[in-house]
C-alpha cells in the first residue's frame, strides 16, 4: 500500500528547508524588477517599489522562522534581533550568514549588515539610466518588515560600497532605528 501524496496545506511548518534553484529565483526576481520598472517614472521609485514588495514578506518570514526555531521566542533586545537577522534570517534567505554586522561609529541609532556577494544583485543587468539602482532594496524591505513586526521600527536601505581590489561592490544594508527603540534599549 503506497502513501498518498500529502497536500501542501497539511505539511507541518517545522519541516523542510524550502530551498529553490538559483536560476528559478533569478528568473522570478528579474520578472519582479521588470514588472516594477513598467510601472514607475523615475529610478528611485523602482527601489521604493522593491522595498515595499520585500516589506510585505518580512512579517511572514519572521513568523515562519519563529515557528521553525527550536526555542521559538521573540527577541526583545536590540542586539538579539540584529543577531537573529544576521544569522538565522540570512541563512534562511541566502543559505549563509551575512558577512558582517557592525554598529555605526557616527550615529548610535545606525547598524549595518554587509554581504560581499548579494544574490539579488548577481544576475541583474540594468540600463544606463538605472545604473545606480540597488536591487538589494528588496532585501532591505524584508529586513524592515521583520524589524517593524518585531516592534523595532526602523528605516532600512541598501547601498553599494566599493571594495578596493574587487570588481563588484559589496552590499551594505543600513538600519536606522527610530528614537524610541534606542531609548527602550539604553
Curated annotation (Swiss-Prot):
Presence of the UniProt keyword Calcium in the record: no
Keywords: Endoplasmic reticulum, ER-Golgi transport, Golgi apparatus, Transport
Cell location: Golgi apparatus, cis-Golgi network; Endoplasmic reticulum
Pfam families, alphabetized: TRAPP
Primary location: Golgi
CDD domains in alphabetical order: TRAPPC5_Trs31 (cd14943)
Disulphide-bonded residues: none
Entry GO terms, CC: endoplasmic reticulum; TRAPPI protein complex; TRAPPII protein complex; TRAPPIII protein complex
Domain of life: Eukaryota
Any one Gene Ontology BP term: endoplasmic reticulum to Golgi vesicle-mediated transport
UniProt family annotation: Belongs to the TRAPP small subunits family. BET3 subfamily.
Subunit-level organization: Part of the multisubunit TRAPP (transport protein particle) complex.
Function: May play a role in vesicular transport from endoplasmic reticulum to Golgi.
Protein name: Trafficking protein particle complex subunit 5
Species of provenance: Dictyostelium discoideum
Organism taxonomic ancestry: Eukaryota, Amoebozoa, Evosea, Eumycetozoa, Dictyostelia
Annotated gene: trappc5
Amino acid at each position: 500500500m503506497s502513501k498518498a501524496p500529502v497536500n501542501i496545506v497539511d505539511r507541518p511548518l517545522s519541516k523542510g528547508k524550502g530551498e529553490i534553484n538559483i536560476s528559478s529565483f533569478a528568473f522570478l526576481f528579474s520578472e519582479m524588477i521588470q514588472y516594477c520598472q513598467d510601472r514607475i517614472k523615475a529610478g528611485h521609485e523602482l527601489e521604493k517599489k522593491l522595498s515595499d514588495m520585500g516589506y510585505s514578506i518580512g512579517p511572514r518570514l519572521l513568523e515562519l522562522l519563529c515557528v521553525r526555531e527550536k526555542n521559538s521566542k521573540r527577541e526583545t533586545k536590540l542586539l538579539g534581533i540584529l543577531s537573529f537577522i544576521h544569522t538565522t534570517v540570512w541563512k534562511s534567505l541566502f543559505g549563509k550568514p551575512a558577512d558582517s554586522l557592525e554598529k555605526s561609529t557616527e550615529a548610535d541609532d545606525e547598524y549595518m549588515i554587509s554581504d560581499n556577494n548579494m544574490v539579488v544583485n548577481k544576475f541583474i543587468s540594468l540600463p544606463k539610466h538605472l545604473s545606480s539602482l540597488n536591487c538589494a532594496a528588496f532585501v532591505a524591505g524584508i529586513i524592515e518588515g521583520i524589524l517593524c513586526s518585531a516592534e523595532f521600527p526602523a528605516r532600512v536601505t541598501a547601498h553599494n560600497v566599493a571594495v578596493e581590489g574587487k570588481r563588484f561592490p559589496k552590499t551594505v544594508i543600513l538600519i536606522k532605528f527610530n528614537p524610541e527603540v534606542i531609548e527602550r534599549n539604553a
